[in-house]
């Protein structure tokens, strides 16, 4: 059995008197798409900061290979596409040393050629998310963390985004860890779903989210509407 690339073991984190996450355990498997969902204030940002080494756990253990290269796109970046700089120049700033080689490979499946000379501020939502993905992989990471990448995208753009993510992980052998509020899209496109509300309410593979299952009931209790998962689309 393959060793997970990240493992949280009974992790808790306190900030003063606040305990945003309590006794959290989960694993992230190599080359999977793992999605973390939960309401506002559930501790999702704290999980990401712990993954990135920006915070240390108050108790518990986080097992992560120190050589693991992580590409991270924060939520705020995804919501502020107003930079007065071209796509090509922006990517070059992120990875100047190996830019030419990497951008050719990225271009082969993300297809930035027709927008590379456009200013970021002029891009559509779908085009901007392509740039977000390119930013996350331009330095050849083993794992990419995407914080709410589907916000402000229509259904068609969301599906195109997931198609790109699948292509990227297969071509580059990259693991994907995502935070999302869009449960229905998550269920269709993730290998593993983790539901967080300060602690792990439920986790598993999408086909375990069946009506009246423990997983489905936990999601419903947090306000996630799961019934429409039964319908054929």
UniProtKB/Swiss-Prot annotation:
Gene Ontology cellular-component terms listed: plasma membrane
Enzyme Commission code: 7.2.2.20
SMART domains according to UniProt: AAA
InterPro entries linked to this entry: AAA+_ATPase, ABC_transporter-like_ATP-bd, ABC_transporter-like_CS, Metal_Ion_Import_ABC, P-loop_NTPase
Highest rank taxon of the organism: Bacteria
A Gene Ontology BP annotation from the UniProt entry: response to zinc ion
Record-given protein name: Zinc import ATP-binding protein ZnuC
Species the sequence originates in: Rickettsia conorii (strain ATCC VR-613 / Malish 7)
Primary gene name: znuC
